[in-house]
UniProtKB/Swiss-Prot annotation:
Organism field: Capsicum annuum (Capsicum pepper)
EC code: 2.3.2.35
Tissue: Expressed in fruit 20 days post anthesis. Confined to the placenta of green fruits at high levels. Barely detectable in the pericarp and seeds as well as in the placenta of mature fruits.
Protein name per Swiss-Prot or TrEMBL: Acyltransferase Pun1
Gene name tied to this protein: PUN1
Reaction(s) the record says it catalyses: vanillylamine + (6E)-8-methylnon-6-enoyl-CoA = capsaicin + CoA + H(+); (6E)-8-methylnon-6-enoyl-CoA + 4-hydroxy-3-methoxy-benzenemethanol = capsiate + CoA
Length: 440
């Protein structure tokens, strides 16, 4: 299959807007965005799920057009789910408010003229996978009035399907997305059960109010896809265990986590591949739902995050045991902080505003700032719409460089990393011998 012309493989069969199955009460018409929500650009979080074996679930149908039946099934369950996730059926009124007007979510049905294996086995799979995401949409700046949720179901010639979701980052983070996907897939599986009602808790501005710092203007992050590339790396369980054991022995850190050792290794290798190595910084995003008092439930919807970071100013700082030791120290410090009053992410946003910069842009003169989003232990591979677990879960190729995304590899204890770097840096990064030792 020639990947050079992916658009020729795609034909859009249907485009519609899915409204909530019941009207949103007037008391919930306006959803207030928090300070962290407002600090984010209007980009989507794009992800896709590949299901190679999809069987007809509409027993009473004899129509041969399976795509239309799959789409109808997903549209019906999405409509029911949007009753609880009503802000995603609305539109941005401004950078502080979502108008929950039941405008609906956009839904696309697409045919792809190749087999799923041609995409999953493609030598540049992280690029090929984007064929199942809405064209030109992933990571795009969603202007005010645009759709806050876009879904695409793609059917391959082999009979498999992919379900992709572009989920507004303005309203929720990766944990929020997983809550939505679990609820939507549960409603789809149990469509005969009318008592299954999702119960997300929209936090809004109740935790991070704008009263202290004032409202924000929407930041614009310009996409740099022409210069940045994504690489998919698999750290299998046996090699990851060996890496963890090696780091534990050399660092003195007890039971280093998968995320600690993998992010440290990626940071080290990416920094070495950079033309301007040091000083460099690694910023980890941190889910603070369980760190806030009183604790927030797992089904809390919003951007509920903070950050912690480590720095490397000389070559000794770049040794793997040192990096992991510093990561463990900083995360322990983060857990002792009041994540409302001492939230490092908010402090970074405020400081950036004062200097007229974007967050993490040239932080304190560092040559390179890398960010890491750790989704390990977030069970994306258990999202089951009725066709079993997905063969692969992917993230759309990102708009900017120097980003690491970590998640579980399928249902095991391995790690799948999505690394986004500048093209020239990536060519050096992927040849690093220490990295090659621990990936599949």
């Amino acid at each position: 299959m020639a990947f050079a012309l992916p658009s020729s493989l795609v034909s859009v069969c249907n485009k519609s807007f899915i409204k909530p199955s019941s009207l949103t009460p007037s008391t919930l018409r306006f959803h207030k965005l928090s300070f962290i929500d407002q600090s984010l650009s209007n980009m989507y979080i794009p992800c896709a799920f590949f299901y190679p074996k999809v069987q007809q679930r509409l027993e009473d149908s004899k129509n041969s057009d399976e795509l239309s039946h799959i789409a109808h099934l997903l549209q019906t369950s999405l409509s029911q789910t949007l009753v609880s996730y009503y802000p995603y059926a609305g539109k941005l009124k401004d950078n502080a408010t979502v108008d929950c007007n039941d405008m609906g979510a956009e839904f696309l049905s697409v045919r792809i003229k190749c087999s799923m294996s041609e995409i999953l086995d493609h030598p540049h799979a992280s690029l090929a996978e984007s064929i199942v995401l809405p064209k030109d949409l992933p990571w795009a700046n969603n202007c005010e009035g645009g759709n806050l949720l876009v879904v695409q179901v793609s059917k391959f010639d082999c009979g498999g399907i992919a379900i992709s979701v572009c989920f507004s980052h303005k309203i929720g983070d990766g944990c929020s997305l997983l809550n939505f996907l679990n609820d939507w897939s549960s409603v789809t599986r149990d469509r005969t059960t009318t008592t299954l009602v999702p119960s997300p808790r929209f936090v809004g501005d109740s935790v991070f109010s704008t009263q202290k710092y004032g409202s924000l203007i929407t930041p614009q992050i310009l996409s740099d896809l022409n210069q940045c590339v994504q690489k998919r790396l698999i750290f299998p369980t046996d090699k990851l265990d060996a890496l963890r054991a090696k780091v534990a022995e050399e660092s003195g850190v007890k039971n280093p986590t998968r995320a600690e050792v993998v992010s440290a290794l990626l940071f080290k290798c990416a920094t070495k591949a950079s033309s301007s190595m040091l000083p460099s910084k690694l910023v980890h995003f941190l889910n603070i739902r369980t760190m806030i008092k009183p604790r927030l439930p797992r089904n809390a919807i919003g951007n509920l995050s903070s950050i912690f970071s480590i720095e490397a100013t000389n070559m000794q700082d770049m040794e793997l045991p040192t990096l992991v030791r510093n990561l463990r120290k900083e995360v322990e410090v983060a857990y002792k902080k009041d994540q409302v009053e001492q939230n490092e992410l908010i402090l970074e946003v405020v400081e950036s505003m004062r200097e007229g910069k974007l967050p993490f842009e040239n932080m304190d003169g560092y040559k390179n700032v890398y960010t890491c989003s750790n989704l390990c232990k977030y069970p994306y591979y258990t999202v089951d719409f009725g066709w079993g677990r997905p063969e692969r879960v992917c993230l759309g190729n990102g708009p900017s460089k120097n980003a690491f995304f970590l998640k579980d590899y399928k249902a095991g204890q391995g790690v799948e990393a999505r690394v986004m770097l500048h093209k020239q840096q990536m060519s050096e990064f992927e040849r690093n011998e220490e990295l090659l030792e621990f990936i599949a």
